[in-house]
């Protein structure tokens, strides 16, 4: 679906003949602007098929200051809230970063923490979905497939204990291998 979104965007906007969505400005243009939000919605609905049905998104401020003066702030590539109040972060990481999985967790945690409000609050949290495009193959022993989904799960029962946090890693370098395997599955039966 991503290919079709990018192709449609280029045709509609008469942008440059080629646009590389792995480049920061292009990624933010494709996924993080009002006039291209249909591309983001289509992509997210496909990625979270049967879990999310997004009809609209509202783009939120991408820069969040630290909670205290000495805390590090964050700058999301794309940050939006769905029509159902679910928070979505979409990141593109071109170069390998040793602690990228930790960074994604930190970004997700920041989106969760910022939901806390002063005064009377019942601790009800909106779900936060973080999607990480990675243009490298991670050295992490956990991230070995094209797509890896992380959720809060009980180790013993393997049951999901909360739907309030989900991180999806998409390793673009493994896409061809993934597509080849998917095609073989279709032909095998």
PLM regions with names:
Residues 2-189:
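Elongated, amphipathic alpha-helical interaction scaffolds
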């Amino acid at each position: 679906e991503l290919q079709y979104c990018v192709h449609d965007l280029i045709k509609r906007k008469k942008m440059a003949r080629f646009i590389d969505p792995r480049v920061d400005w292009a990624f933010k243009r494709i996924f993080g602007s009002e006039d291209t939000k249909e591309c983001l919605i289509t992509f997210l609905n496909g990625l979270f098929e049967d879990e999310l049905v997004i009809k609209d998104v509202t783009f939120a401020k991408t820069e969040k200051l630290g909670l205290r003066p000495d805390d590090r702030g964050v700058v999301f590539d794309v940050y939006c809230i769905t029509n159902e109040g679910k928070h979505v972060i979409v990141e593109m990481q071109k170069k390998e970063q040793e602690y990228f999985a930790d960074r994604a967790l930190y970004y997700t945690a920041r989106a969760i923490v910022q939901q806390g409000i002063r005064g009377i609050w019942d601790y009800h949290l909106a779900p936060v979905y973080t999607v990480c495009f990675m243009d490298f193959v991670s050295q992490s022993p956990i991230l070995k497939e094209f797509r890896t989904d992380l959720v809060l799960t009980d180790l013993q029962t393997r049951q999901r204990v909360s739907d309030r946090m989900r991180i999806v890693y998409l390793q673009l370098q493994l896409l061809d291998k993934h597509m080849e395997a998917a095609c073989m599955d279709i032909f095998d039966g």
